């Protein structure tokens, strides 16, 4: 089980990074103001899943993830620092592929949106309520045709 040694505020009005070091939460505020916010969307899937159940399932596997953690840290740093949309998109795709392998689950794009021309990133419990969508073109019509009506721009989401 993951037990935090100190309470941590998990809701914030600003971007953060979060990690555990020796069961202690490390929360850092980050400056995330990419020049390509018009290419970032959030789609509500209405497929609520339990993060707790996903975490427990993962923890029962007893995998050594030190290499994965290092790779994820590198990707996180890149996504925070880059102002290049294709670089950001590729980094997000790499993160999603790594998590897919670790969790032994197909990505949300593979499962629901394999014909989408862009990036789809699971948020929260994999395949849960929201996904982040990265696209050169407005993807709202695509997702509406798939039956998803709630599509928010980056600006709408961060209000």
Regions of interest found by a model, annotated:
Residues 2-125, 132-159:
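C-terminal nucleotide
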């Amino acid at each position: 089980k993951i037990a935090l040694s100190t309470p941590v505020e998990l809701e914030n009005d600003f971007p953060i990074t979060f990690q555990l070091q020796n069961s202690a939460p490390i929360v850092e505020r980050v400056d995330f103001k990419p020049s390509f916010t018009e290419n970032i969307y959030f789609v509500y899937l209405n497929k609520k899943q339990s993060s707790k159940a996903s975490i427990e399932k993962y923890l029962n596997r007893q995998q050594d993830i030190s290499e994965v953690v290092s790779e994820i840290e590198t990707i996180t740093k890149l996504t925070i620092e880059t102002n290049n949309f294709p670089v950001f998109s590729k980094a997000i795709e790499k993160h999603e592929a790594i998590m897919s392998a670790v969790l032994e689950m197909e990505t949300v794009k593979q499962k629901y949106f394999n014909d989408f021309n862009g990036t789809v990133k699971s948020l929260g419990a994999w395949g849960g309520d929201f996904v982040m969508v990265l696209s050169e073109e407005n993807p709202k019509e695509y997702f509406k045709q798939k039956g998803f009506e709630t599509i928010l721009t980056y600006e709408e989401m961060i209000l």
